[in-house]
Swiss-Prot record:
Lineage: Bacteria, Pseudomonadati, Pseudomonadota, Gammaproteobacteria, Chromatiales
Domain of life: Bacteria
Subunit structure: Part of the ribosomal stalk of the 50S ribosomal subunit. Interacts with L10 and the large rRNA to form the base of the stalk. L10 forms an elongated spine to which L12 dimers bind in a sequential fashion forming a multimeric L10(L12)X complex.
Name of the protein: Large ribosomal subunit protein uL11
Family: Belongs to the universal ribosomal protein uL11 family.
Natural source organism: Alkalilimnicola ehrlichii (strain ATCC BAA-1101 / DSM 17681 / MLHE-1)
Keywords of this entry: Methylation, Ribonucleoprotein, Ribosomal protein, RNA-binding, rRNA-binding
GO-annotated biological processes: translation
């Protein structure tokens, strides 16, 4: 018989940087999950990614306190900030532009995000990422 799910926990944790301190420890502790076991498994799974890059993770906790987790791709905004070389987006995206991204950079980000985007093809994914870039105050070249 299948195990019964008791909770889903959604977190954003830096790649390779999971540790028992907040936010990871309290979120898992209240569901009775072995925190160190999760931290070791998560860090092992994300070790090939750039250290510290925020990675969304969905943890499924079962009644017997066992768990499974699925890592997603880093948020588009983080990848766009890295591509544009900026610290944060614009507070007034329509009036103050803070950087520029090219179509090639957007395609690279779209290929990275492809598993998590529900776009029909690469072009639709690029347009979606371009919309995120515009809302952050980035100029989009070549689109």
């Amino acid at each position: 018989m299948a195990k019964k799910v008791s909770a889903y926990i959604k977190l954003q944790v830096g790649a390779g940087k999971a540790n028992p301190s907040p936010p990871v420890g309290p979120a898992l502790g209240q569901h009775g999950v072995n925190i160190m076991e999760f931290c070791k498994a998560f860090n092992a799974q994300t070790q090939e990614m750039e250290a510290g890059l925020p990675v969304p993770v969905v943890i499924t906790v079962y009644n017997d306190r066992s768990f499974t987790f699925i890592t997603k791709t880093p948020p588009a905004a983080v990848l766009l900030r890295k591509a544009a070389g900026i610290q944060k987006g614009s507070g007034e995206p329509n009036t103050k532009k803070v950087g520029t991204v090219t179509r090639e950079q957007l395609e690279e980000i779209a290929k990275t995000k492809e598993p998590d985007l529900n776009a029909a093809d690469l072009d639709a994914a690029v347009r979606s990422i371009a919309g995120t870039a515009r809302s952050m105050g980035l100029d989009v070249e070549g689109l």
